[in-house]
Swiss-Prot record:
<feature type="binding site">
    <location>
        <position position="158"/>
    </location>
    <ligand>
        <name>[4Fe-4S] cluster</name>
    </ligand>
</feature>
<dbReference type="InterPro" id="IPR005971">
    <property type="entry name" value="Protochlorophyllide_ATP-bd"/>
</dbReference>
<keyword id="KW-0547">Nucleotide-binding</keyword>
<comment type="subunit">
    <text>Homodimer. Protochlorophyllide reductase is composed of three subunits; ChlL, ChlN and ChlB.</text>
</comment>
<keyword id="KW-0560">Oxidoreductase</keyword>
<keyword id="KW-0149">Chlorophyll biosynthesis</keyword>
<dbReference type="GO" id="GO:0046872">
    <property type="term" value="F:metal ion binding"/>
</dbReference>
<keyword id="KW-0067">ATP-binding</keyword>
<comment type="pathway">
    <text>Porphyrin-containing compound metabolism; chlorophyll biosynthesis (light-independent).</text>
</comment>
<dbReference type="InterPro" id="IPR030655">
    <property type="entry name" value="NifH/chlL_CS"/>
</dbReference>
<dbReference type="Pfam" id="PF00142">
    <property type="entry name" value="Fer4_NifH"/>
</dbReference>
<dbReference type="GO" id="GO:0019685">
    <property type="term" value="P:photosynthesis, dark reaction"/>
</dbReference>
<comment type="similarity">
    <text>Belongs to the NifH/BchL/ChlL family.</text>
</comment>
<dbReference type="GO" id="GO:0005524">
    <property type="term" value="F:ATP binding"/>
</dbReference>
<dbReference type="GO" id="GO:0016636">
    <property type="term" value="F:oxidoreductase activity, acting on the CH-CH group of donors, iron-sulfur protein as acceptor"/>
</dbReference>
<feature type="binding site">
    <location>
        <position position="68"/>
    </location>
    <ligand>
        <name>ATP</name>
    </ligand>
</feature>
<keyword id="KW-0602">Photosynthesis</keyword>
Length: 295
């Protein structure tokens, strides 16, 4: 007798975090999840993009999804407490919290939340992200938000840290013009393609960061159907803005700074008006190895 094993739905089993339909973000808000190789500049990109959206008159919420809780400090000019830390203080009785306990106003009115995460080696970061969205909904803090940006830990695409993809309309992948960054990007494309079968998330495009050239990124895009939405060269003012704990929009308006500001504003406008969902087709590892590099 032959038995058939049915594949579980997305979110069933030990490798996924099941989406609670009651904690979906309201229709109408543009929800963007930012992924990329660890250390590639996702938090810098997310914060400056949030600032750009706010400059366009949008009400913006940025949610940091990294236990390091360093996503939003250039917006708030300080390290803010995490949702998980605040919940622990009240023994996870969220009804005892006020919005000011866990949500903080940053540059130009951008609202900032750091979800935090469980101690190393314990728990699931995706669960924490879900609880953060649930808490925001309980306090009706998403109802008037135009743009939500999830800044996600490293290039981890397990069921837990893929959780923001369950809320997002689009995913932006931050990459440099090098093998390791593009290799990580390919893994992320695979995760998004898997999630797109059951959720609304689609690829929004690529952000080339800290790269003078984009020839290797261009090769990858051509093979996989991706598109570069913005290109930020290795401008020292961006590095210095992190050290000054501020966004690029608060730096002295030199020629380089204005160029970067305009690129972020252009990216924000395109995400609002001109973004086309991309059908990314990830490569096999050997294919990337053979594709990238020089003849």
């Amino acid at each position: 007798m032959t038995s058939t094993i049915n594949r579980p739905l997305d979110g069933e089993g030990s490798v996924q975090v099941k989406q609670d339909p009651k904690i979906n973000i309201e229709e109408g808000a543009l929800v963007i999840a930012v992924y990329g190789k660890g250390g590639i500049g996702k938090s810098t990109t997310s914060s400056n993009l949030s600032a750009a959206f706010s400059k366009l008159g949008k009400k913006v919420l940025q949610i940091g999804c990294d236990p390091k809780h360093d996503s939003t400090f250039t917006l708030t000019h300080k390290m803010v407490p995490t949702v998980i830390d605040i919940l622990e203080e009240v023994d996870f009785h969220s009804e005892e919290l006020r919005p000011t306990d866990f949500m903080f106003e940053g540059f130009n009115g951008v609202m900032c939340v750091e979800s935090g995460g469980p101690p190393a080696g314990t728990g699931c970061g995706g669960y924490v992200t879900g609880q953060t969205v649930k808490l925001l909904k309980e306090h009706h803090l998403l109802e008037d938000t135009d743009v939500v940006i999830f800044d996600v830990l490293g290039d981890v695409v397990c069921g837990g840290f893929a959780a923001p993809l369950q809320h997002a309309n689009y995913c932006l992948i931050v990459t440099a013009n090098d093998f390791d960054s593009i290799f990580a990007m390919n893994r992320i494309v695979s995760a998004i393609k898997a999630k797109a079968k059951n959720y609304k998330v689609r690829l929004g495009g690529v952000v080339a960061n800290r790269s003078k050239d984009t020839d290797q990124i261009d090769k990858f895009n051509e093979r996989t159907g991706l598109k570069t939405m913005a290109h930020f060269k290795d401008v020292d003012a961006i590095r210095r803005s992190r050290l000054k704990k501020c966004t690029i929009f608060e730096m002295e308006p030199t020629e380089d700074v204005i160029e970067v500001q305009n690129e972020y504003l252009s990216l924000a406008k395109n995400m609002l008006e001109n973004v086309e969902p991309l059908e990314g087709n990830p490569l096999k590892d050997r294919e990337i190895f053979d594709l990238l590099g020089f003849d």
